[in-house]
Amino acid sequence: MATLANLTQTLEDAFKKIFITYMDSWRRNTTAEEQALQARVDAENFYYVILYLMVMIGMFSFIVVAILVSTVKSKRREHSQHPYHQYIVEDWQEKYKSQILHLEDSKATIHENMGATGFTVSP
């Protein structure tokens, strides 16, 4: 039984050594040029990802800042001394002031269409 256990152990070690040696040689079966090329490709892909992210974030930031600046600029223009805006502001203010000052003078007016026929006015 000792020889069988020893044989099993020996076969296991032999197969393990052959398999590991084969897999290591298969994995490392590349030339130095191929390894250098693979390292360069890996590095370039990573740098292009960073460059891509920087460009995308920059474009997004530019658009956001442009929208913000245009909004602030248009709001500032609304409150400027431009004649169009002054006309609207003064016109509405005068209209409301005159209505408030003459509230007691307001009267109800009824207009009657004398040309309408077929309708009678109830007393």
Curated annotation (Swiss-Prot):
One Pfam entry name: ISK_Channel
GO CC field: apical plasma membrane; membrane; plasma membrane; voltage-gated potassium channel complex
Subcellular location: Cell membrane; Apical cell membrane
Effect of a null allele: Mutant mice show increased pentylenetetrazole-induced seizure susceptibility and mortality associated with a reduction of myo-inositol concentration in cerebrospinal fluid.
GO biological process, one term: protein localization
Membrane-topology descriptor: Single-pass type I membrane protein; Single-pass membrane protein
Keyword Cell membrane tagged: yes
Cytoplasmic-facing ranges: 70-123
Residues in the signal sequence: none
Protein keywords: Cell membrane, Glycoprotein, Ion channel, Ion transport, Membrane, Potassium, Potassium channel, Potassium transport, Transmembrane, Transmembrane helix, Transport, Voltage-gated channel
Record-annotated membrane-spanning stretches: 49-69
Keyword Zinc-finger (UniProt): no
MF terms in GO: potassium channel regulator activity; voltage-gated potassium channel activity
Purpose of the protein: Ancillary protein that functions as a regulatory subunit of the voltage-gated potassium (Kv) channel complex composed of pore-forming and potassium-conducting alpha subunits and of regulatory beta subunits. KCNE2 beta subunit modulates the gating kinetics and enhances stability of the channel complex. Alters the gating of the delayed rectifier Kv channel containing KCNB1 alpha subunit. Associates with KCNH2/HERG alpha subunit Kv channel to form the rapidly activating component of the delayed rectifying potassium current (IKr) in heart.
Subunit field text: Interacts with KCNB1. Associates with KCNH2/ERG1. May associate with KCNQ2 and KCNQ3. Associates with HCN1 and probably HCN2. Heteromultimer with KCNC2. Interacts with KCNC2. Interacts with KCNQ1. Forms a heterooligomer complex with KCNQ1 that targets to the membrane raft and leading to currents with an apparently instantaneous activation, a rapid deactivation process and a linear current-voltage relationship and decreases the amplitude of the outward current.
Family: Belongs to the potassium channel KCNE family.
The protein's name: Potassium voltage-gated channel subfamily E member 2
Organism for this UniProt entry: Mus musculus (Mouse)
